Amino acid sequence: MASAGLYRRVLPSPPAIDFASPEGKKIFVEALGQGTMEGFFKLVSYYQTQSEPAYCGLATLTVVLNALSIDPGRKWKGPWRWFDDSMLDCCEPLEKIKVQGITFGKVACLARCNGAHVEAFRSNESTVSDFRDRVISCCSSEDRHLIVSYHRSGLKQTGEGHFSPIGGYHAERDMVLILDVTRYKYPPHWVPLTLLWDAMNTIDRATGLQRGYMIISKLKRAPSILYTVSCRHEGWSSVAKFLTENVPLLLKSEDLKDIQEVLSVVFKSPPSELREFITWIAEVRRQEDGNLTLSEEEKGRLAIKADILEQIRTTTLFKHVTSWLDSQRSRCRTIAKLQDRDMLPELAAGVCCQGACLLTGCCLPGGKCCSQIDVKHLNVDHKNIVTLVSGTVASGSSSEQGVDVLVPLCQMGPEGHCIGMHPSTADVLTVLLLALPLHTWSGIKEEKLCAEVTSLLTTENLPPLLQEEVRFSLETVLF
């Protein structure tokens, strides 16, 4: 016997005003004249209904990412790269979200993981006046959009926690337009800003933290040039917990005497996924008729990567990390989790396979879709040498596609061999340490050692490019 089901809900009005009602249209026209509906048209062009009852956070973010014209870097269907809520899986398993929904922090994490700039404010970190100012700023722009996390009961609606984008603002009435992504339940509607603030100023029982709002915009450059936190890796959350929660406790419990002992606490018994947590970004391109030349844009990007890598290697922290790794070489088991994929051919095979997935749709695990891995060294400008790793991808039953992986740096050794061809374990661990909050080290008992560690890990004196790399990694870890 079929169940009756539900067909929509009556929008509680007041306090809400249906966007399509005569009064809702009047408010829209007035707000349009005030210049606070500028973001509406981009948002409504990509406005969609969430595909699952608990996907409000994913659908909201999908609307905003598409409105900002952010390239997801992977295919949706056919040849098309496009954000769909089923693709936002890098911070929380979709099966878990489908049952439990998603929290404020994880939505912010998803936005960052997918290439957006995020400014997140929980209600206890802001005021209603701050919120109003930011609503006006975002609604007066096409380039910044505001997402709200609120409890529906505050608007006399059925349901609990919910996410939606804000589509506009009316100054005289002090009302905001909520583009509700549960369009099967409620239509877009205007609500008083202060009432929405009260609905945001509530506790999410899943985390014990306040709800809030976040501003999403497009990054002016790639989120990271050389390194990225691998939040798509299934073990990333356990690694983040180890680094931000366990490490501070371990440091407090040990009587440490020098930097080497501090590094041992952090790296001797890490989670098995640590080696995958921060990875270097390689550039992948299709092979074009055996063309081995680089475009000016490719040369520029590789030069920046080489600069950042050089900046890492000139830090005192890098020297300490290198010394610690050298001291552990004879204990292979100790550092196996950190170095099991440090050889360029193995790394390149994995990157080649990821590139193949992006460029051809061939997505096989473990680098199995790439064959005939070949390493070449190209003179870029008679001074700098770039490493080019080529592979062949079987993209169909009989067709093949050549794929090139551009490696950031190649230095020639005394015998003419290429050395230091890619970011090493020492480079990655250095960036990882720099990305941790300074309060991580505050529990070190020996005051002089604590001061020395803090000095080593302070980022304010780093070169700007390296600061930006570290800042992005830090923000991702904290979310």
Swiss-Prot record:
PANTHER family: GLUTATHIONE GAMMA-GLUTAMYLCYSTEINYLTRANSFERASE
Residue ranges constituting the Peptidase C83 domain according to the UniProt record: 1-221
Protein name, per record: Glutathione gamma-glutamylcysteinyltransferase 3
Annotated control of activity: Requires cadmium for activity.
GO biological process, one term: phytochelatin biosynthetic process
Organism expressing this protein natively: Lotus japonicus
Pfam families, per database record: Phytochelatin, Phytochelatin_C
Main EC class the enzyme belongs to: transferase
Protein family membership: Belongs to the phytochelatin synthase family.
Protein's job: Involved in the synthesis of phytochelatins (PC) and homophytochelatins (hPC), the heavy-metal-binding peptides of plants.
Encoding gene, per UniProt annotation: PCS3
Tissue: Expressed in roots, nodules and leaves.
Gene3D superfamilies: Phytochelatin synthase, N-terminal domain
Keywords associated with the record: Acyltransferase, Cadmium, Metal-binding, Transferase
Induction remark: By cadmium.
GO MF annotation terms: glutathione gamma-glutamylcysteinyltransferase activity; metal ion binding
Top-level taxon in the UniProt lineage: Eukaryota
EC number(s) recorded for this UniProt protein: 2.3.2.15
Coiled coil: none
